Amino acid sequence: MKIGLIGTGRLGLCFALLVERAGYSVLASDNREDYIKDLQKGVLGTTEPNVHDLLYSSKNIEFTTDNERVIKECDIIFTLVATPSLEDGSYDVSNVDDVVSDFNQIGWRTPLNGKSLVVGCTTNPGDCETFQRRLNDDGVEVYYNPEFIAQGSIVKDLINADMVLIGGEGKHRDELVKIYYGIQ
């Protein structure tokens, strides 16, 4: 099974590398072309502990700027894009909206039945239900899986998670649990 990731920032990169270490084939995308080129060359500009070792020992991860490729080639696609806080305390989910729009645009041309989108970034109450409604016609299942981590200990926090929350039901639910037990 191939796992996709859209949003390969600090958290996304750590998560993708741990999923790869657990034995999955991973295709990770980000919209920052220079950043992806650096990752493809093995150049890493982060001080996050343990990431260098994970990147250099990885054998089955590929980096791209092509979200469409991730959506078409992968069965389960995690999105860990930025959702910054707004002044009113809510979250700006426009980056997640963009990912859902990518699914919709591809769904017009290519059947997406059986694929799952796992929203791993912080969202507002009700957002995942909205994303699911937008993806129903494409046959995509939406799960909510927020990460509980701190900058500077992302890898450690993912490996030693106090809890894992997976909201949603569908054919990939059990596989999501396996992924999380695999990275721990």
Regions found by a protein language model. Give the residues of each.
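Rossmann-like NAD(P)(H) cofactor-binding subdomain of soluble oxidoreductases
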Residues: 84-153
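Internal alpha-helical scaffold of NAD(P)-dependent oxidoreductase catalytic cores
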Residues: 129-143, 154-184
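An anion/phosphate-binding loop that grips the pyrophosphate of nucleotide cofactors and donors
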Residues: 73-74
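NAD(P)+-binding Rossmann beta1-loop-alpha1 motif at the extreme N-terminus of oxidoreductases
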Residues: 1-43, 63
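N-terminal glycine-rich dinucleotide-binding loop that anchors FAD/FMN and/or NAD(P) in oxidoreductases
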Residues: 43-62
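Short amphipathic alpha-helix with an adjacent loop that forms part of the alpha/beta core around
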Residues: 67-70
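Nucleotide donor/acceptor-binding cores
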Residues: 1, 115, 162
